[in-house]
Each structure stands twice: as structure tokens, then as C-alpha cells.
Amino acid sequence: MQDGDPSVHGETAAFKNAGRQRSYRGTTMVTTLSPCWFCSGLIRQFGISRVVIGEAQTFYGGHDWLAENGVEVVLLDDPECIEMMTRFIAEQPEIWFEDIGQD
């Protein structure tokens, strides 16, 4: 969650920062976590071809759905990403649960 806006995730911020493009096909998006359903929809809507995911242990988002719908998904399950997110969740549970839309 960036700028105090729970809809601004890393994926949406990257997409916005990329600006208007003729096409996003052939684009690789790199994420720390498995994209949530909101971000997964963005990826599919604009035809992003490949997603590289740092880890999907702390949050299991829509990456299976993306793969089932033709997006190449590379799941690293990187220990550094897992540790970073585990620490963040422990230190900032209120922000984490707001970000993922859970009570």
C-alpha cells in the first residue's frame, strides 16, 4: 500500500509509472508477492505476458489463475523475499491486513 491508498500495490504503481503504451504484450512484470486478484486482473486486462514472483508463501494470490489463462508465471519462492515479508507482516499487521483486504 503506497501513498495511503490501499489500491496502490507494487503492480499497480509499476503499471502507472510505465505510462501509456501501445501494447503491454511481451512485458514481464516482477513482483515480490503473488499478485492479488485486483493486480492479477490488471495483468490479464492489459496482456502482460510474463510474471516473475519472489514468493507465494505469505500470500497466495492469483498466479495459478494467471497461468491457467496463458500468462507465463515464474515462482521463485526466494528465501530473502519470504523473510522480508514475514518480518513486515509481524511488524506491521494492521497495514498488511488492510492491504490484502482482511480483518
Q: What do these predicted regions represent?
A:
Residues 1-86:
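Zn2+-dependent cytidine deaminase-like catalytic core
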Residues 81-103:
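Acidic/histidine-enriched, glycine/proline-rich intrinsically disordered or flexible terminal extensions
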